[in-house]
């Protein structure tokens, strides 16, 4: 059987520009079961900090900054980058077909089809039994009705995902991971035994449960073992997850920011225990794992649990888990990377400002060894999808400025295809060529910059409103494209939130911290969020807040016409 490397894909993450919302880039919470001193977090992702970066819910800033996981340009970047690292597919953390995770799944499938990539499901089955689903199914108040919908969602995945060429399957069996916390044993048995309508050639789905590996610390040493339960008997096997953290963080000064932690050596022992567990449970597939780090402070443990930690150790933790898997090379069918992009728990391998492409380089090197393939390519190859992404954005900006860009888009599609097929030299040449071409095209664009100040009378604040008197600026803003930012100070005197709206579109949401100080912030106001621009741009304020010192900076751009 062909060995596979898959990566967990976390979400949702959105942007005001693309989606009119932020998803999990914004987060406020308290780690309810934590005993550490600092267990509260507040990330206002609409705000641009003094260093020019958005205040994102992460402790490791993405290399490409805040992007939308519904943006096809961004998904193309992610998939092409993953393919260069010998990753075969993403397993989307999914809830049900009406849940917003399904939007990401459908968009991901479209791009995956173009790029020859697989998509699987890590089913967050607990989401299915929250009240969320009742918003879409008013009669789903009983557990029985929710179970009926669960069966419908299995059939939905078969029909929509797994019968396509991108659906992750092994020997004709769709792969579904169950994260746990939703179904009980009896309910799952009924789900698994149901006769689903399968297309010709497809076999029944394989369901894998998260491995119940438990640890115990004695005399500064940790031992792991399988905690046998009924799940290991009724599913088709288990899959590895983040190594269990059992050391007492509060007992040490170094790890006092967390309740629990694990070391690099613990992670290695976890892998050994996982392989033993897969043998004991007679898993139909052996699905091991690698994990670079764990730090759930950015999400305050999802406002529920305690805080735990595994140090990245400058990439050594991730590499050591890969080495352990190489020792068991003949005993595994799949390596599951946890994760591609979970920034809130800081176990992403997607490139960041802090770590660059280091974890992807590690993945490329060890995944090829584990698969028995030649490790082709160079570290510089990873830059190609990023360069393509920025060219995509440049072309979209030229289009907003008034240029016909169909020809350029076709050229970029060709570059994506070359990267997909590892025609690196050709992709490099075409990238250099179109970069030079677009530099010349940009010379046709005229930029104008404007600054409106409250103290000059161009901005007025009234109760519940900020009024920007655009006057002659309106013509420039409607003639082509523009970028704009609003700066202001607010009195941080409560723990409540306030919001800015333009008509029916939310521009920002700020959660205050009751510091009793004036805070100065800067937020972008995207052209996509301003509908029906008039000479007076009225921003409605929702919530009680004092505002002062408002300024509005605009950079307009359009095609130069003689």
What residue ranges belong to the model's regions?
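Short beta-strand-plus-loop segments that form exposed binding edges in beta-rich domains
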Residues: 537-545
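Short, surface-exposed beta-strand/strand-loop-strand elements in extracellular ectodomains
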Residues: 496-506
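Glycan-processing catalytic domains of CAZymes
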Residues: 1-448, 525-528
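Extracellular carbohydrate recognition and processing domains
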Residues: 505-533
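Solvent-exposed strand-to-loop "edge" motifs in beta-rich extracellular domains
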Residues: 481, 487-494, 526-528
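Glycan-recognition and processing domains
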Residues: 446-480, 553-562
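Intrinsic-disorder/low-complexity, polar/charged segments enriched in Ser/Thr/Lys/Arg/Asp/Glu/Gln
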Residues: 465, 483-487, 518-522
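Extracellular beta-strand elements of beta-rich domains used
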Residues: 523, 537, 550-557
